[in-house]
């Protein structure tokens, strides 16, 4: 290039000094997630975690999971509320491996952002650290990737990765599910982290850029209390963090509860997740009467579904419908498992039952 001139990394938009300040800002919150197996601290080329504790298991099976938060982040950016999306990230990963009965051991995060600002980054990572503490796993590493010229300064995306362990004899397996089994549900906090592409259409945030007057006006609108939500605002209801079910479920399983398998209800709703926990010759019959489910649905899900004029089947394959986690148990164990869950502070309810079939989810009002 004949007209070339000296250009630094900072000239290109990457502020390594601010990146260093961001690392300093999160060091203590990361350290606070440590388990005894963690070796060293952040800053190395890899996160170190001792496997010595696995020697007490008969046949330890490592289970990994990775996921993101999706377009819920668009709403967080418009509202300038970043403290809880990290919990969403952790939940999406650890709840997935919990479905096999695995205990999450450690977690890593990846943040892609247009411009790193230490205070902003600390808010995001605080949510990740809080989620790790709720799940009992260590945050052993991560990456902050600044993407100047590719992403707008305030834009960011999150991805996470977790590794857990379960002893093979205790691993949950859909093959254990039989006709007659009962499906129990644990409540969600709301929409959790799936269905936000539809939510964005309903609340009219598509095309609005964070930090603009349009974003400020929309944030004010979404902060108004709504009677349909019991006085809560759409912003509060839609940004409620995804529940992390790890500690009560692991305590339940360690107590010997005879759970056949578990389904984490995420993208695709009940219809496209509960089937993943079924044996090939079993169907799940979910209790429903038209638009009414057999349990209480969070008002925000009902509100969005009505605004979008979703048919019941469409709603059930878009949203969790108030069910964050399903546990499948034998009918003779339903009362004992329910009692144990209540003792752990949970509020279980019956979602449906299993019948002979071909691995599908069907609804009672369509049989």
Question: What residue spans do the PLM features occupy?
Answer:
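Glycine-rich phosphate/pyrophosphate-binding loop regions near the starts of catalytic domains
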Residues: 28-189, 285
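Glycine-/charge-enriched secondary-structure boundary and capping motifs
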Residues: 2-11, 120, 124-131, 135-138, ...
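Hydrophobic face of alpha-helices
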Residues: 23, 122-125, 196
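Buried hydrophobic packing segments
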Residues: 26, 48, 93-94, 199-202, ...
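Residue-level signature of catalytic and energy-coupling elements of molecular machines
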Residues: 15, 67, 180, 264, ...
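Hydrophobic alpha-helical scaffolding
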Residues: 12, 16, 80, 189-192, ...
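N-terminal amphipathic/basic leader segments beginning at the initiator methionine
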Residues: 2-37
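Short, acidic (Asp/Glu-rich) active-site segment that either coordinates a divalent metal cofactor
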Residues: 66, 157, 170-230, 234, ...
């Amino acid at each position: 290039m004949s007209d070339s001139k000296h250009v630094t990394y900072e000239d290109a938009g990457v502020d390594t000094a601010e990146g260093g300040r961001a690392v300093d800002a999160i060091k203590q919150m990361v350290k606070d997630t440590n388990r005894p197996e963690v070796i060293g601290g952040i800053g190395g080329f890899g996160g170190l975690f001792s496997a010595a504790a696995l020697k007490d298991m008969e046949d330890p099976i490592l289970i990994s999971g990775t996921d993101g938060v999706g377009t819920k982040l668009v709403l967080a950016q418009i509202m300038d509320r970043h403290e809880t999306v990290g919990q969403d990230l952790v939940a999406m990963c650890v709840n997935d491996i919990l479905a096999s009965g695995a205990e999450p051991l450690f977690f890593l995060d990846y943040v892609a952002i247009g411009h790193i600002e230490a205070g902003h980054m600390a808010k995001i990572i605080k949510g990740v650290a809080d989620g790790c503490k709720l799940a009992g796993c260590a945050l052993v590493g991560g990456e902050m990737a600044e993407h100047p010229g590719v992403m707008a300064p305030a834009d960011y995306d999150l991805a996470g990765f977790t590794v857990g362990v379960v002893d093979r004899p205790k691993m949950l397996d859909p093959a254990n599910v039989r006709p007659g089994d009962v499906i129990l549900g644990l409540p969600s906090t709301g929409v959790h982290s799936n269905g936000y592409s539809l939510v964005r259409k309903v609340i009219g945030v598509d095309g609005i850029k964070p930090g603009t007057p349009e974003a400020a006006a929309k944030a004010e609108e979404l902060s108004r209390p709504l009677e349909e939500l019991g006085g809560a605002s759409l912003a509060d209801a839609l940004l409620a963090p995804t529940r992390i079910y790890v500690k009560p479920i692991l305590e339940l399983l360690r107590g010997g509860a005879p759970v056949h398998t578990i389904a984490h209800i995420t993208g695709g709703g009940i219809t496209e997740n509960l089937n993943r926990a079924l044996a090939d010759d079993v169907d799940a019959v979910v209790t429903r009467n038209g638009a009414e489910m057999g349990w209480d649905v969070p008002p925000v899900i009902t509100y969005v579904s009505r605004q979008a004029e979703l048919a019941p089947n469409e709603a059930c394959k878009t949203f969790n419908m108030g069910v964050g986690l399903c546990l499948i148990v034998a009918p003779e164990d339903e009362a004992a498992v329910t009692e144990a869950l209540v003792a752990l502070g949970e509020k279980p309810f019956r979602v449906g039952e299993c019948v002979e079939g071909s691995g599908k989810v069907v609804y009672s009002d369509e049989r």
